[in-house]
Structures are given as structure tokens and as C-alpha cells.
Amino acid sequence: MSYFIISDGKEIKSFETAQDHKRVLEGDKGANTGGMGAYSPSRLLNQPLEEKILNKIIKPTITALEEMGSNYKGFLYAGLMIVKDEPYLIEYNVRMGDPECQTILPKLKTDLFEIINACCNENLQDINIEWNDKKSKCIVLCSKG
């Protein structure tokens, strides 16, 4: 599962989740890729799991960055594996994922510029990020090679 937040160094705002498909062939077969498709929201997420993700992974990471003198501003993308309702961090990226963001951004009702501007100016607490409740899919078409 892909879990996204944006932080202005003080405030954390969660974005929608997504689930990507890395294998080049149907049925989870073939070589790994950067992502052949995605859907949002992830069917794995529920309220108790989201609380675990925030409290065990995201918030401690932001706190550790602060303790190291880094006032992190921007997107943080946690690539997670969920085992028996427990989240395990596989990777972090400091960007939106692709193709995940192609499923997430169409669901965003709040102006993305306003969110990023608030992030840059340390005013995320003043932004209410709103989403539509639709589901979204993305399929990547690519050439062989």
C-alpha cells in the first residue's frame, strides 16, 4: 500500500492512499516495474490501520527528522507492506508516487496549489484537504523494451 502525507515541518496532513501493481504481466507475473497501474483508495486501509501507520511510522519519522535538525517540508510517500493488520515500512520517497498520484489527484477537491503554498509557508493547519468519495484507477500503457 502507498500512504502519502504532506508536512510543513510542523503539521502533517494525510492524502488518499493507493495500491500499485508492479509486475509487468497480469496475475502478478513477470518482472517488477516502477508501476503498471494503481487504484485509489487502497482496500487495505481502515481507521485502526491508519492510526498505526501514523503513530508507528509517519509521526516518529517526522519527529526524528526534527531531532536531527531537519524541518522537513513536502510530500512523504511510505511504501508499506501490511501483514496481519500491522504496517511495515518498505521504503520512503520524498515525492508522490507514479502511477499512484494519477489515481489520487483526480479525487482531490481542494486546490493543490493552495495545499503546496500552505506547506511552503508553514500554514498547513489552516487548510482543510477535501476529497471526493469516488474510486479511481490508472493503467499504464508502455512499449516493450
Task: Tell what function each PLM region has.
Residues 1-102:
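Internal nucleotide-binding/catalytic subdomain
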Residues 54-76, 93-145:
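Active-site "cap" helix and flanking loop/linker of ATP-utilizing ligase/carboxylase catalytic domains
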